[in-house]
Amino acid sequence: TNRAAEEIKERLSLLSIDDDINIWVGTIHQFCLEFIIYPFKMNLSRVSKGFTIIDDYTQRAYVSQINNMLNLNLKTYELNKIDLSLSHDFKINEVQYTQVSEMYHTMLEKNKEIDFDMILLVAYKILTVNSNVARNIASNIRAIYVDEFQDTRELQYNVIAKLLQNNPQIQSMFVGDIDQAIYGSLDGIAKSVEELEMLTSHTFQSKTLHGCYRSNQRLVDFYSNFQSCPYEIESRGNNKNDRGFISYDCKVTKEDLPNIIKNIIKEKIESGIHEKDICVLAPQHYPLFSLGEYLKKELPYCNFDAINISPIKVNNHSLFFKLAILYFTESGEKVRRRKLIANDILIILKNEFGIEVKDYFIDLDLLQLINSVKRMYSGDDNGVDLYKFVTKHIFVNLNIDEKNYPSIFKHYLFFINEVEDRIKNNSLSSSVSSFKKMFKSRDGITLTTAHKVKGNEYDTVIAINLLNGKIPHWNEIFNVSDKGISSARKLLYVICSRAKNNLFLFSEVGYFTSKGDLLYPTQLLDKIEFDYNI
């Protein structure tokens, strides 16, 4: 994930190791774009004449449009189940609604677009159609280190393997934890040493770490209940003998829960715990939207790192998301990062939208242009209006008009529509300060999902919505042979192992199925016998 990549960058920075021309840190999708697709796209006809990456909002809009065109009258949840992926030879994988997937990909190709999942496929095809490309890239790599390898997909392994096969001198390392393999539903695979060796033609040594420098021993003992492959974990941090606080409440109502969480946060902050050491998480986003707004109102003196429940959805591959970062952050802060983002924007304009900015116009020029236009804004206290104002002037200054570049305007409209939908549907503030808050440094209380929290650690973790149907999800309960038990075990392991000292778990009462049945607590959690604090 992007957040895990940022975490690695921060840890390198603490060691006085900044990512420069010799070190690159990022997601596999970012790697595929920067190292394979952008420089070598001419080798694959599907993207050789340019391409734009659509986001999931645009994807849903396309599928909904096709649904109407075919008069299928499928509901949203039915549309979401349609497999839009392609095989390695660009064939449709969907079985039941093949025409939907076919029309979707025809639409993408006509528009010179690819979706997020196609990034991997396109990169792999480029490496296979021209062996010189793989050799060229591999010859410039000394080492490849893969974190969270248990969540790596088959196609991701294949991309990495192509490079390793073309340079036996590359040092490679795969690090992960089988108990944290929470992306199985997204085809994540934890390959064995033997499988890796066969795939990459490299030899690996297998090693296991038994020490934990994060959680106290009591917490370790608690979340060891959720191990898939039991082995003893020893707490070795300075807090190893601390008792901490572990509670589980399955009787509180969803109406009373926000106030309880507010009081927990107040108590922890008053006891000296930093805001950045507190995390509130849920299995899915939607309970966090209203909870986040409530906490911001009730705790106005607190800062929140709640980018996942903000007006703009995080999308590090999006031109318009990157522009938003520059619009809503201060010009004199983190100049190096702002220059990198500005450079990314210029690259995307060229590679995805075919917009050739003049050679002498560099990242600093873009930053100066944005800063000057921002100072011109005198409209209402509205983040969307500010965004539109600055973007309009940027386009004019760069000679980007709708007649010559219709694609960028189409995607700009999709972006604005999604922002306005998120504000309306989740009752979010549209003030400029609300937009700025989402891009502030991660020093506040974190609100995020169980999947996004992986790789991070906090003194205090507050987990809500631990209910059957959420963990495990209904899709796993109905469609997986073990009814989602394995998935639930791993997700609970990830949630609980984020905490250093304090863990508050809630299976709140008041959620119902579409048939009106009350959702009950996640069974794996409900069955555990433990000496809770409450």
Predicted regions and their residues:
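P-loop NTPase Walker
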Residues: T1-N43, S497
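Coupling/switch/interface segments within P-loop NTPase motor domains and analogous charged loops
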Residues: S45-K110, E356-P406
